[in-house]
Amino acid sequence: MENEGFHVLHVYVDADACPVKDEVYRVAERYGLNVTLVANSPLRVPLHERIRLVVVGAGFDAADDWIATNAGAGDIVVTADIPLASRCLKNGARVIGSTGKPFTDATIGQALAGRELSQHLRESGRLSHH
C-alpha cells in the first residue's frame, strides 16, 4: 500500500497461537500500520479499518502458506514458527518472534538447526516436556 509516496508497513500475524496480538494492535494504531491476522479459525479482532482477519481453513500449514505467499519486502511478520520465519526472510520480509526477538538471515540457520535437533531428540525419546 502506498501513502503519499511512502510504503505503508504491513504487519502479518501468525494469529492462532500468537500471545502478543494486543501489543500488535497497539503498535499498529500508534504508527498507522496495516495488520492482517491469519488464522485457521475465526478469531475476535478489533473493528478497525487497518485490521483484518483472514481465515484460511484447517489445512496443515495453510496459515503459514498464506503468510509466506503474501508477505514480501518491507513487510513485518510476527510468528514463533521458525520454518515460516525462514520462508518470510527469503521473501524480504522482516520477522519478529512472539517474544519480540527478531529473526534475521544471520540467526535463522541456527534456529532451524536447534528446532530440528529438538524434534529429533523428542522423537527418539531422549527429550521430554517436563
Model-inferred region functions:
Residues 2-130:
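Nuclease catalytic cores that cleave nucleic-acid phosphodiester bonds
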